[in-house]
């Protein structure tokens, strides 16, 4: 539920390396 400061509209979350995932076009962590 914490925004990772990255969008995932056109590309996947690069922050997935630290546990972020794409939700509603924005990368979130927990």
Swiss-Prot record:
Q: How is it modified after translation?
A: This is a cyclic peptide.
Keywords, A to Z, come to:
Disulfide bond, Knottin, Plant defense
**Placement of covalent cross-link Cyclopeptide (Gly-Asn):** 1-30
- A Gene Ontology BP annotation from the UniProt entry: defense response
Any Pfam family the entry gives: Cyclotide
What family does the entry list? Belongs to the cyclotide family. Bracelet subfamily.
* Role played: Probably participates in a plant defense mechanism.
Question: Could you tell me what this protein is called?
Answer: Cycloviolacin-H1
What organism is this sequence from?
A: Viola hederacea
Lineage, uppermost ranks = Eukaryota, Viridiplantae, Streptophyta, Embryophyta, Tracheophyta
